[in-house]
Amino acid sequence: MEENIKIEVTDKDVYKHYFSSILIYGIVFLALSICPVLNEQIEHDFCNYIVVLGAYYIGYVALALPIFLFFRPESILESRSVAILDFIKRQFKFGLTVEERIKNIEPKENEKQALVILFVKAFFGYYCVNLLCNKYILSMGYNIDFLKEFFNQAVQYGSVSGSSFGIAQYIDDTFDMWRQLIVMVITFVLGFSYLTELDLFKNKIKTVDTTPLGIITCISCYYPFLILTDKLIPRFPEQAIPVDNFTLRIILNVLVVLAHLGMMLAVLRLGTKAGNLTNRGIVTSFPYNIVRHPEYSMNMIYIILTTIPVMLLGEFSMFGKIIIACGIGLWIYLYYLRAVTEERNLLQDSEYQEYVKKVTKRFIPKVF
């Protein structure tokens, strides 16, 4: 009977992985730093994605080698950085025939996985860090003070006109701040997940979706690709909802905040396993024991809440309303495609296959 033999991680393996990684990550950081489209998003000199990712890269360069030498993780033996460099080196081999050259252009499966995982970490890691720096971190204290101040005003409203009116007025004044704080929490969790991959956090990437449809449907929802998506599919921000009726506006605002709370709950439940395109392990607790894609369900609800009022209450022609209705349908279909393509990757995992048998609906409990 053959015994399982543990392969030793040598110093050579460690150094090869380490220097391959700092080279690959350095190239990625340089590309992100000089990309004009991304640089246009920088709003603050000392709090921007270049500073944060630069500090992250320097920390990796300084700390990774001694950590690798001490712990010697077996994942080094299947280094994705080494796989990427092997793929790049193969493109520059001399003396190959045309057939061999064409064959070399196609990455091997481990190389394809490594390349897409690198893209996912770089693109979505940048996206989350940039969003936090530009919109949330520096204004967090102001937002919290704003909510406290308006809460005090709401108490005053309630003492004069009744508690119901005070609560309603508080919601009307502060719903967008609550929405921003919720999105900040979601973005922080996602950013942490994208920029870490450790056994300690139980978020090692098993597989990633490498299909063109899966990647395109995912990145089309994020800047800068969102610019093109917005050109093709009409979209309206919630601030543009033309609702003059106070009661209806309060109801819509509450529903929008609840939808965001649903998104946050779904992301927090995933924790360090959260993220697009990747399988980092299966989560089956609430709300994932109700539907398989609760975050996308909440996104669909959010789309409906911020577009249906535009269509019904705005001054649009019949043709304009048809265009808006088509836009709503296309955005919802985009999230449906994201769910389907994600599951195509996740279904390679036997644990997810069992999960699908137990939780049979994607978006709406007992319906769809």
What do these predicted ranges mean?
Residues 2-277, 305-347, 351-368:
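Membrane-anchoring alpha-helices and their flanking helix-loop junctions
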Residues 285, 289-292, 357:
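Short amphipathic alpha-helical coupling elements at transmembrane boundaries
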Residues 280-288, 297:
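Alpha-helical membrane-protein architecture signal
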